[in-house]
Amino acid sequence: MPLDAAPVDPASRGPVSAFEPPSSHGADDDDDHRTNASKELFGLKRRVVITGVGVRAPGGNGTRQFWELLTSGRTATRRISFFDPSPYRSQVAAEADFDPVAEGFGPRELDRMDRASQFAVACAREAFAASGLDPDTLDPARVGVSLGSAVAAATSLEREYLLLSDSGRDWEVDAAWLSRHMFDYLVPSVMPAEVAWAVGAEGPVTMVSTGCTSGLDSVGNAVRAIEEGSADVMFAGAADTPITPIVVACFDAIRATTARNDDPEHASRPFDGTRDGFVLAEGAAMFVLEDYDSALARGARIHAEISGYATRCNAYHMTGLKADGREMAETIRVALDESRTDATDIDYINAHGSGTRQNDRHETAAYKRALGEHARRTPVSSIKSMVGHSLGAIGSLEIAACVLALEHGVVPPTANLRTSDPECDLDYVPLEARERKLRSVLTVGSGFGGFQSAMVLRDAETAGAAA
């Protein structure tokens, strides 16, 4: 229910859902919640499933358009149109066709909310509707939000700075020109608060910012919240809209982005021998996560189960990666162990696949270490070849791609992969999507700062068989 809704008489609510025990048994409510929270102590973790998905991405708003783009092998990378990119080394990006008015945002929301927050809320609304949850039967205190972002409200902060400083010419800030919403832009935790407000979540609400693994880690944190019993429903995912002059210049300075400006559509080429950096992008994905038993009891459509998750830091270098892939391999092993999935049962790997020289080399080594010879039999692909790298959001978009791959039995391709690299010698599904029965898939992320995360997802049929 909305946060400002009037209290509802429990007797008038009719049948209750699996998320809210009958109010006439208050003591039993506490017992049920304690039972859920104590399952972990006895090795009976609550299983977590995805029952709703929402996507806003370059080349596609909503899961249908997103999936059509991924399976077509087309790319959404173009010359930057948001501003004149000619002064910059990298002049290409993957911009989303996002109209906040068409999305239903009113004047007050448009005035208050940064573009990244709008993406997150739009995705949360889509996921909520797709989940089939009835807001009137949810206990708001048992609903939470876990949102990730790498640069949060960078778009609005940069705009406000330009206004305050006369485009950088005046270094004295005149408070009279300051937007009354500057606080909303400055404090990253406003983003999950906006989502909580939109969906009526009064449970645990957290902000995750672990660079390019934020989208994986925010969902992983939400899984933990349900497993430990502190929430029954979590809205989880990530949003980033980093296509701004300062962010573009930032990655220019460290030579992380591509300089293939004369061929934007083919600029993002993970694992290709001619790769020269990633393509900056924007996007968001949000999920509704629930306890498996509760989702089953209400007859929900289960898209996938999140059966394992792990994250770690290599404590090595802010941007550098060791060529042997040891730390990422260990992260993968921990996720597989938690999932109780053997390496030989992984049917597809959704790679981080950023398109930088060192990352793709590092990943290839990690898959060989973690999966052994099975790595050579497993298709690996990078959707960044088509939708670019949306920093903190990409991990959630890649989870969405895995969910859709499991449901459709199709592996998305790695676009633009035409030139082999002897150090990247696995099956990277070049150019064309591939039909394949998928039961268990692995998705990984790697971020500046040494963050490395991995997640195992299972299809609904396999999840049911494991019950």
Curated annotation (Swiss-Prot):
Pathway: Antibiotic biosynthesis; actinorhodin biosynthesis
Keyword Repeat included in the entry's annotation: no
Keywords: Acyltransferase, Antibiotic biosynthesis, Transferase
Keyword Transferase attributed: yes
Region (Disordered): 1-35
Entry GO terms, CC: cytosol
InterPro entries found in the cross-reference section: Beta-ketoacyl_synthase (IPR000794), Ketoacyl_synth_AS (IPR018201), Ketoacyl_synth_C (IPR014031), Ketoacyl_synth_N (IPR014030), PKS_Beta-ketoAc_synthase_dom (IPR020841), Thiolase-like (IPR016039)
Domain Ketosynthase family 3 (KS3) span(s) in chain numbering: 45-459
A biological process term (GO) from this entry: antibiotic biosynthetic process
SUPFAM superfamilies cross-referenced by the UniProt entry: Thiolase-like
Superkingdom of the source species: Bacteria
Catalytic residues, chain numbering: 212 (for beta-ketoacyl synthase activity), 352 (for beta-ketoacyl synthase activity), 389 (for beta-ketoacyl synthase activity)
TM regions (residue ranges): none
Molecular functions (GO terms): 3-oxoacyl-[acyl-carrier-protein] synthase activity
Enzyme Commission code: 2.3.1.-
Entries under PANTHER family matching the protein: 3-OXOACYL-[ACYL-CARRIER-PROTEIN] SYNTHASE, MITOCHONDRIAL, POLYKETIDE SYNTHASE-RELATED
Family statement drawn from the similarity comment of this UniProt entry: Belongs to the thiolase-like superfamily. Beta-ketoacyl-ACP synthases family.
Name the UniProt record assigns to this protein: Actinorhodin polyketide putative beta-ketoacyl synthase 1
